[in-house]
């Protein structure tokens, strides 16, 4: 009887251990398959709108603050080198660099503002994109795996994989390559080149120091909000994919999903109007929502 009781107790312990293990496995599976998110689309949209507002206000302030200094550069080589850097980077499109250097901005700095908006929007796009390779080239391989998973797995599976992968990838990537300060310094560099291309006087180092001193905090705040989007979209949302977008010139303008920020709103659109042509540059971030 004692032997039978001991055997029954052993079997019970084994069964309890097995049950605990299976329960833990089910909890893990439930976590992996759960698609409930704490972040609403409205919150994400509000964040993107805040980023766009910061881009506009920062570009407008910088372009206005330097209005008295456009065309005062004493050395044409400095202007030419800045135009070359902008042209090579494609950060403000193919046409704007030369236009900036050959236009008188002293009366109206609107072209400077547009160029600054374009540069800041493009840099914010790279900072906000979860799979951007502009700073972390390691993510390119992970993104290719994710793209393949999206073709064959459920949203709950590849969405959870994305959140976990990006969370742990961020943990091992050096802070100096991914923090707001690094992105802000990149923004300062391109603001500097735009101003130099417009003929602002001073050496590249002097103008850059001015930009950093007077607008560094603004640009870091912009970079911080872009990284907030990156973290939320990449690491917190499972049930859908949210991505910021920019349109690369010279793509054709499509009014069904693009907005012409400088259009004449007083002039009614005609259904027989000719195509609007190609875009010059993108000045704001767009937002795409995908759910499979």
Predicted regions and their residues:
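Internal, charge-rich low-complexity segments
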Residues: 3-260
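Compact beta-sheet-dominated globular domain cores
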Residues: 167, 248-292
């Amino acid at each position: 009887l004692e032997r039978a009781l001991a055997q029954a107790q052993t079997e019970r312990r084994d069964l309890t251990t097995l049950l605990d293990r299976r329960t833990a496995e089910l909890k893990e599976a439930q976590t992996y398959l759960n698609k409930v998110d704490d972040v609403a689309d409205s919150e994400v949209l509000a964040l993107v709108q805040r980023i766009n507002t910061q881009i506009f206000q920062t570009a407008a302030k910088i372009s206005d603050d330097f209005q008295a200094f456009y065309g005062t550069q004493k050395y044409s080589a400095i202007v030419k080198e800045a135009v070359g850097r902008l042209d090579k980077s494609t950060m403000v499109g193919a046409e704007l660099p030369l236009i900036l250097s050959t236009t008188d901005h002293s009366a109206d700095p609107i072209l400077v503002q547009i160029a600054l908006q374009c540069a800041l929007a493009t840099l914010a796009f790279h900072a906000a994109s979860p799979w951007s390779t502009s700073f972390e080239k390691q993510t390119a391989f992970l993104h290719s795996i994710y793209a393949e998973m999206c073709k064959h797995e459920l949203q709950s599976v590849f969405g959870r994989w994305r959140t976990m992968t990006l969370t742990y990838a961020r943990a091992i990537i050096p802070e100096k390559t991914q923090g707001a300060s690094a992105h802000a310094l990149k923004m300062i560099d391109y603001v500097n080149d735009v101003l130099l291309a417009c003929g602002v006087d001073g050496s590249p180092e002097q103008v850059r120091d001015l930009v950093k001193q007077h607008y560094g905090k603004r640009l870091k705040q912009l970079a911080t909000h872009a990284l907030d989007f990156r973290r939320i979209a990449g690491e917190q949302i499972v049930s859908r994919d949210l991505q910021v977008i920019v349109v690369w010139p010279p793509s054709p303008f499509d009014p069904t999903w693009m907005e012409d920020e400088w259009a004449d709103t007083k002039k009614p659109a005609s259904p027989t109007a000719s195509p609007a042509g190609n875009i010059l540059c993108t000045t704001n971030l767009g937002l795409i929502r995908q759910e499979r």
